[in-house]
Design a protein with these regions (language model features):
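Collagenous Gly-X-Y triple-helix signature in extracellular proteins
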Residues: 1-185
């Protein structure tokens, strides 16, 4: 695999190839340095959704999430950086009662109307991962369990890192020293 161009110019096919190579070869991947530099710089990618809006996204993790099929790690994890999907509620009661596992938003993001906003070219490249999530919700304390997701919300721990909850802080946030006491959005 030869990735000569800057990460900001990677096509979806190249993003997928980079993710696969990093998953296979880790830091020895020929694309690792470019992916890490893109993550550290906050390089944004974009694509048109099926509703005509533009989704912007960036790399937040490298070899961070376990693939749900047990075959290894997802080479790259991405995060949306704009509100192309609009403001969404977790469930009909507009709370997190029931947690992520039972949420209306999880269904909508992984197989419903929000998933269908992603172009088929992207849908075919997204690999399900296993996430550790607090499925009690309602701010009632941690009871982490596993869910399988293609698209997911980040847990507080995945962003802040200094909480005893679900998941592990993503490298993008950790490298910037983000904690719950200093995060400004």
């Amino acid at each position: 695999m030869a990735i000569a161009k800057d990460a900001k110019d990677w096509t979806l096919d190249e993003q997928e190839a980079v993710a696969k190579d990093i998953a296979k070869n880790g830091t020895s991947s020929i694309a690792y340095a470019k992916a890490k530099a893109a993550m550290d710089a906050g390089t944004k990618f974009s694509m048109k959704l099926t509703n005509g809006k533009t989704l912007e996204y960036r790399i937040i993790g490298i070899n961070h999430d376990d693939l749900a099929d047990g075959s290894g790690m997802a080479g790259l994890t991405f995060e949306a950086t704009n509100s192309a999907l609009g403001s969404q509620r977790m469930n009909a009661t507009d709370t997190n009662a029931g947690g992520w596992d039972k949420s209306e938003l999880r269904t909508r993001l992984n197989s419903g109307d929000l998933w269908l906003l992603l172009p088929s070219e992207l849908q075919s490249k997204v690999k399900p991962v296993t996430k550790t999530t607090d499925n009690v919700g309602g701010n009632g304390g941690g009871a982490p369990s596993a869910t399988t997701d293609k698209v997911f919300l980040l847990s507080a721990t995945e962003v802040y890192g200094d909480m005893q909850s679900d998941g592990i802080q993503y490298e993008c946030y950790k490298s910037k020293g983000v904690t719950r006491s200093n995060y400004s959005g």
